[in-house]
Amino acid sequence: MAAARRLRTLQSQPENKVCVDCSQKNPQWASISYGIFMCLECSGKHRGLGVHISFVRSVTMDSWSEIQIKKMDAGGNERLNNFLAQYGISKETDIISKYNSNAASVYRDRIQALAEGRQWRDPPIVKESVGGGLMNKKPPLSQGGGRDSGNGGWDNWDNDDSFRSTDMRRNQSAGDFRSSGGRGAPAKSKSSEDIYSRSQLEASAANKESFFAKRMAENESKPEGLPPSQGGKYVGFGSSPGPAPRSNQQSGGGDVFSVMSEGFGRLSLVAASAANVVQTGTMEFTSKVKEGGLDQTVSETVNVVASKTTEIGQRTWGIMKGVMAIASQKVEEFTKEEASTWNQQNKTEGNGYYQNSGIGNKTANSSFGGSQSSSSGHNNSYRNSNSWDDWGEENNSKKEAAPKVSTSNDDDDGGWAGWDDNDAKDDDFYYQPASDKKSVGHNGKSDTAWTGGGFL
């Protein structure tokens, strides 16, 4: 903030409100090398001079150091113009000529010394002619005769009067010269066929070739590794390529690429040789086979092997086909037998059930003389519940023991009393209350038999 404030203070001074090199007001750029303020257009020209001549900064957009602020304090637009005026350089002088002058160099040294706090004493003033300096100097015009260095009028190439008859070029013709005040003015863009003979052109070409050959020989004699400004060799367009570095080893090379290329070349040679050998061997073997009749024997052997293979394959397929047919037949027979066995068992059990039911009814009728329909109906229900437990046993009714006779007088509990008294006779009795709510006992044949695993 302090640097910006000091810059605004310097910028607000009357002599700094106008550009140092032109009349543009309110400059926003500065050259630290001289401590001056300038406009945008002039700052671009100062940048073209280089930072060693003029170091340009923006007043508002760039950061400033303390030494740079001190340089701006030591300088000023009016001070610079007054200093350069002592050397004969005005404000309107071209920027390139002005700041490349000796006076500008002295002023830069002065600003640097004052900013660093060193003592400074101005050197003696020597007037400079910027217009006659190196930047604006022009070669003198040719004044005719022998005082001219023979430049051929190239300083005034667009002026036909500047040419003399002695300065003929290859694009001029001798017949197109006209006399004017003792000097001839050639016409432009003319052919040179009438100026030089063929022998002269050939001699000129030979001289040109010898000249360039001499130059190339001189270039070859120069050392390598040095720039041309220090006496080194020129390398570029028109130069012969430098010799490739050769390795001291004869069998290989230090360069990886050369080794790889050499290896691939050798590999290709080996592959080509191997291919030739294989081709030659194949041709020899073929010729020998044909000469000895081996080709016919080989073909016969191949035919025999093929026929045997086909026969074996057909036999194997026939065997497998027969095995599959037998297996399918066996599976079908087993399925049919299982189905017939299942149907026969169901039919046998049904017949035995109805026989037992009939026997039970007859016994009940002979014993009690009544309640036939009730007893028969309940026997059917009981048989249906027990028929699935012994479906695998045939003629179960024929193998059962003789029934036991028992009566029951329990009218209220329907035979459920005493079911847990472990009485063996409970296993052979079946109690069924009558339709008129009277308990009826019968000596029916039992359809179940007790085993260790339960009822069957």
From Swiss-Prot:
Functional description taken from the UniProt entry: GTPase-activating protein (GAP) for ADP ribosylation factor (ARF). Involved in protein trafficking by controlling ARF1 activity; may participate in COPI vesicle formation at the Golgi complex.
> In the record, what terms sit under GO molecular function?
GTPase activator activity; zinc ion binding
What protein does this entry describe?
ADP-ribosylation factor GTPase-activating protein AGD7
Instruction: Name the keywords, alphabetized.
Output: ER-Golgi transport, Golgi apparatus, GTPase activation, Metal-binding, Phosphoprotein, Transport, Zinc, Zinc-finger
Name the GO terms of the biological process aspect: vesicle-mediated transport
Species assigned in the record: Arabidopsis thaliana (Mouse-ear cress)
Phosphoserine sites (modified residues):
173, 191
Q: Where is the composition biased (Polar residues)?
A: 340-364
Q: What else is known?
A: Plants overexpressing AGD7 show a relocation of proteins from the Golgi complex to the endoplasmic reticulum.
Its main localization is Golgi
Q: What CDD domains has UniProt attached to this entry?
A: ArfGap_ArfGap1
Q: How does it assemble?
A: Interacts with ARF1.
Ranges of biased composition (kind: Low complexity)? 365-387
Give the record's free-text account of how this protein's activity is regulated. Activated by binding to phosphatidic acid.
Q: What are the residue ranges of zinc fingers typed C4-type? A: 19-42
Q: Which InterPro entries match?
A: ARF_GAP_AGD6/7, ARFGAP/RecO, ArfGAP_dom, ArfGAP_dom_sf
**What gene is it encoded by?**
AGD7
Q: Where is this region: Disordered?
A: 122-200, 216-257, 337-456
Transmembrane ranges? none
